[in-house]
Each structure stands twice: as C-alpha cells, then as structure tokens.
Amino acid sequence: MKNNKIKKQEEIPDELLRESPKTENTAELSEQIVDWLSSGDYIPCKPEELIENMDLADHREDFITAMCELEDKGRIVSMKRGKISLTENSPYLRGIFRANAKGFGFVVPEETFSSRLDGDLYISSENTCGAVNGDTVLAAQIKSSRSGNGKSCEGIIVHIIDHELTELSGTVEPVPPLQRESRCSSGLCVRPDKSIYNFLVLLDDGGSTLPHIGSSVQVKLLSYPDKNGCASGVITEVFGESGTTDAVYASILYEYGIKPENGGGFSDALLLQAREISDRGIIYDNSEEHTGGDLEGRKDLRGEMIFTLDGADAKDLDDAINVHRDGDGWILGVHIADVSHYIKFKSPLDCEALSRGTSIYLTDRVIPMLPRPISNGICSLTAGTDRLTVSAIIKIDANGNIIGTELCESVINSKIRGVYSEFNDFIEKGTNSEYYDKYSVLGNMADDCVQLYRLLERKSKERGALELETSEAAILLDADGNPTDITVFERGIGERMIEQFMLCANTAVASCLNRKKIPCVYRIHEEPSPEKIHNFAVFAHNLGLNVSALGAKNVSPESISLILKEAAQKEIGTVVSYVLLRSLMKARYDNKCSPHFGLSTDMYCHFTSPIRRYPDLTVHRFIKLMINGKFSRKELKEAEIFAGKSAEKSNENELRAILAERAVEELYKVRYMSGFINEEFDGIVSSVTSFGIFVELPNTCEGLVPVSGMNGYFVYNEELLTLSDGRTIFRLGNRVRVKLISADIVHRKLEFSLVGTNNGDTVSKEKNHLKYNFRKKSMKNKKFDKRKNHNQMSDIKRGRKRHRKKRS
C-alpha cells in the first residue's frame, strides 16, 4: 500500500452532511453512484464534482443521503482532498475485527480484499478506534514487515461500519476508582464474562432497583466503549449469583435464545394445537365425516415385519426399517414419520419449526423443534400402533449399488421397539442373549440387516468416504442432574447399522428428487481449499505419512482416505483426524445440488429426521409434490425459492444449536472436573497454539497449559503446528502428564500445568505419536445424553476406530 501515513479517513465536507430525509429514491441512487464509481472511466473527484458529472443537481438532498449511507456501510471512502472512491479501489479494506483479551486484535479481510495481504491485519491496542470483537470495520495498512512465518502487516481502524455485539453477559461490580469520573449515577458496572470484551458497561439506575454486586446479568448496550474503556447499558435479565452453575447455564440459554420452560418454550396456543392434532390421531376410512380418511392413497405396510431401533431413553421414534433378500440383492425399507401430514405448510406450528430449525440436544435436556405431543406422540413410531409414514423402499444389488427407489406415502405398525444395547447383545450372543426372545421374532431379518449393513459399509469405504477418528463424551448425571462421570460414548453394530441405512435412504431420496427435477434442500460439503490441504499435507508428511496422493488442484475423498487409513495403521488416526477436521469445509444446506465431499457422493439430503430437523420436513413436502405430480411452473418456482430460504435459515439454526450444545457440555465438564483440583492426569496434546498447548484427558475433557507456565522460551511454528524451546517440542499427539490447576465455571475453561512427559524432556520422537487409548466403560443401564445418535453426528464419520459416528 502506497500511503502508509493514513491515520483516519478523510471526511465528506460538513456542508454535505446536514440531515436529509431518506426518500424512496435513495436505494436506487446509491446503486447508481456505485455503478458510476465502478466504471473504468471514473477518476476520483469531490462530491460536488460528482453531483455535476452525474447530472444530479436537482436531486442534491437524495444524493447527500445516499453518499452518507454508502460511507456508513463502508462501500465508499473519502480520500485525500475529499475525493470519493469505492473502498475496493482505495488504500482501505473492509473486514471483521477479532479482538484479543489484551487489547490488540486482527482484521480479517472480506474476500474482496483478502488478496492484498498474506493473512490478517494486526491492529495494536491504540489503533482499534474503540472497535469491539465482531465489528465490521474499515482499516488501513500502516506497516508491513517480513517475519519467520511470512509477511506481517499492521494497520489502523479508521471507521466502524457495524456493531455485531448488542448484548452481553457479565457480573455486577462497583465502578473502579479510575472510571468513577465517568457519568454513572448508580456507581455500578458490569464486567463482561468474555475476556475479549475488555471494557466495562456502566449502569444507570433509571430510578429502578439494580441487582446486588456479584449478580450474573445480561446487559443491552446503549453505547459502545469510549476512550476510557467504558460503555453504557441497561440490565435485561438477572441469572443469579455469578460463578454458580445455574447462573452460567441460564446465561447460555439466554445467549442462544433457548427457552426451556413450558415444554421447550412453546406458547400455550401452539401446545393446544399440538395436543389437538395428537389427540385426533389417525382418521380411518370408515369415518362418516372423512370419506377415504388419512389412509387413502397410502401403501399399507402394517402387515410387514418393521421395527424401530433407538437408544433406551429415546421417545421421538421417527424412523423404522425392514430388510429382506431380493435374489442376489436386497430390499431396504426406511419408513419415516409423516410429520408433514400433521404440520401444514405455513401453519403456526410450521412457522415455529422453521424459526427453530432443529431440536437442540443439551446435556440434561432436549429442546424440541416441535411440541412433544407431536414429536413424542402422534409422530412417534410406537410399537403396536398404526402410524403414518413416508417410505423409501430401496433396491440394492449384490455390490451395494442402489438400482431402484420407490418413494411413497405409507402406513406402518412397528412390531418391535428395538434398543441399541439389546440388539447389539442379541447379535453378539445369539441364543445366549437375554434378549433372544424379544428379537428372535425378526427371524432371518436380523442377519439380513447385518449383512446389508456390512455391504453398505464396504461400499462406503470403496467410494472413499472419510472415516475420521474422533470421540464424543457421554456425561452421566444423577437424579438431581449433577455430573457423576464422563466417559467416551461407545457405539455398537446396531448404531452403525442404522447409520448406514439412513445414509443410504438420504442418498436415494436426493437422487430421486434431482432426477425428477423437483426442488430439494440438499446437504452439501464443498472441497477444502488448496491452502488448507497444503497445510494438512505438510503436517501429515512430518508424521511420516505418504501424502503423494494429494493433488495440488484436485483433492479427492479417496486420496485423503488413503492417508487416514495409513494413519490408523500407525495408530495416529486420532491426531490426523483432528487436524483434517480443521482443514475441511463445514457441511451446509443449499437448494443447489452439489457433491458431498466427506461422504463422497454426488448428491445428498436429509430425509430421515423431520421431527427434529426442518430441512427433512421440507424434503418430505417435496417428495409429496413429486408423488402427486400435480403442480404448475409457478408452484415449482415458489418451492425452489422456499428451499433456498429454508436452507439459509437452517444453516443459521444448526450453528446456533451446535454452539449451545457445545457450551452446555463444556459447562458440565468443567463442573465435573472442579472436584479434581490438584490431581494429576495422563493426557494427549490435542491442539498447539502460540499461547500454549491444549491437553485432552481420557474422558474428553480438554484444558490449556499456558505457555507462560512452561519452563523456557517457546516458539510456535504455525506450519508444523509445534511449540518448541529448542530442547522440547510439543506437537499434536504427544502424551503428557498434567495437573489440574483451576476449573473456571464462568468461562467454562480448565487450566493445567505440566508434570512430565512419557519421553522425559524431549517429546518429539515419532514413537510418542501414538493413538490415545481412551478409557472404556460399559454404558449399559446408565443414563446419559438422550440425543439420537444416528441423527446428531456430523456428516463425516466420527468416533474411535470401532465407534465411528456420522450425521445421517
């Protein structure tokens, strides 16, 4: 950047900034201005010249308003001598400010500006212009230099375009002496819980009673930090005493907009509607009021051996299966609760489901997408009860290929309420199983199910679907909801079998809708970026893995699978999987068909969980559109538009659910570990950063060993993901012994100190990169997280070598 002396953005002259009412022409005029500035013939000029050049003298007021709005949004800037330019054509750049607790931060450039820098733009604490973490800002580069890791750039924030932060949680404190000169009638302030918000929020009592000092509260910001580091705000919620589990839990729920009361935060009106639907039940064809009834046009499968298979505590049984041989091949039936029959499009219950997007599976409870009379009642495929379903009847050849799919509305009557642990025991022990009598009624179907599962799994491996080795915590609670133990969740053949069947059904449905040119909410997973794959290849190569299969331009799932397979053979699969996960794109919903990289499929969608995922409910409606075959071009176009909006909303809600689930899980982990202060544990280095190493314990609890607590001067190598002082090298996979120093309930963080390593002072030897043997515990008859396993995993295989998980 040529101009390194920029300290603040030149302003549009004051005489052009007087108040001007916004008119209907403003938005259109703004685009005209942008188009004019974008033209190749444009030479930067002052606003008055621009008015003249664009022949807008008669629209001066609208022009001024439009210019101010464009400047506020960071789309235009005023350069030297007040000349106007598009931000893209100026020395400035737009981006998101990411703050550090110490006051400095980085601007992450928008894609349009990212090519200007090798990385993010460093902003020192004195050059933040009062920006808060998450703000969209306008910045200028003021310095660049070369460091060991490449080009280092420093900049200054010149304008805050938009504040992301509007509310925060924190603890009520007295205003510190240094800030007492600030206007604060109450003498109280809130110190934010998150350290990246390194400012105070002054409270004005406004004539109302404020919570006592030490209260955990939610604050709505009225103003943002000034030069003294003080913002102002009003309290909107009081969670309780700061530092208590209840207060932290309440603040998490509030942060993510989760309402646990009244069966999941549903209004009385919605609950009444749900109960009426559930109580009405199925209307049969002998009803005088409803000729034909709910069964009209449905395939009657009530006489077939169909069964459900779920966790022992599951109540929302939304999928059932049956399998039988078909010559050399197979017929797989996947029967899903027909939620769309009861939840009509754009009804109040449907609008609520769309706004939620997904059920949220917290450690101690489930916040359902639909009221329980629907999810646990009329739409739950209870054994011995007629239930309306949408069925995918899939024909599979001897090689595991899908050669035909029938999608239909159906009615079933499940014969068995299967439980994973029981089914696994039955498959393993046969006639010696205590559950033999229950499952022997399946006859040959039990063996057929297992054989088909093994065929589909083998086909998945041949296709190159990624098999990542990660672990999931199972948090055991007592009757009062207190954590009593944390173990690694183990999966048996039943869980893996259902997973494969659901994956098969989802793939078949996506293919059918795509072939018929019917809209669909696809689940897509894009290829990782070349840069991320390069970094992964460097890491894997330094572990002694063969990375020659990774092409520079066209990375395939098969090439990555070869590396994962070799890593598993060398017992470093967990370490490699952790790094690979960070290199991959996030799976998301889209109305445009695109391959799923992790599953190595050309197309994929979510069909199997309409009770708890809105995209699945939308897909069911599109299936019915295809089955009925009566639709106009206009209806098809409207369906396509809704698919796009639904996908976008579902992506937002999925992220919200993931973050909420993770936050609550972290809280329970820290709460559990708080009983083990000063105790020592063996662990594995799970992440390496410039500020320390993260260590994961056998029970999946993770904490930080800060670099400040290590003996020696450690240097971080970003490319190799190592931290070294010249004698000792820490890298992912190292086994270490640590002592628990603190368990911070408020910030949900554990801190460790190093006690020693398995290889003395040096931990860089390759033999130390061993697969971590997690402690195994039987989960039989123990209460833990009630999530439904085959629908709450990621799209990519996860879990230990024998306990992989996947979102179906």
List each language-model region with its residue ranges.
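Short, charged, solvent-exposed linker or helix-capping segments at domain edges/interfaces
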Residues: 169, 245-250, 404-406, 752, ...
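Electropositive polyanion-binding surfaces
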Residues: 52, 206, 213, 218, ...
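Residues that form ligand- and interface-recognition hot spots within folded domains
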Residues: 239, 313, 526, 742, ...
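Short, acidic/hydrophobic/Gly-rich beta-strand patch recurrent on exposed beta strands
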Residues: 106-110, 122, 189-194, 694-699, ...
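A generic structural signal for residues embedded in beta-strands
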Residues: 139, 219, 688, 738-740
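Charge-lined substrate channels and their catalytic hotspots, especially those that engage the 3′ end
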Residues: 2-333, 340-386, 424-427, 671, ...
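Intrinsically disordered, low-complexity linker and terminal regions at domain boundaries
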Residues: 135, 706-755, 760, 765-780
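Acidic, low-complexity intrinsically disordered tails
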Residues: 1-28, 714-720, 755-808
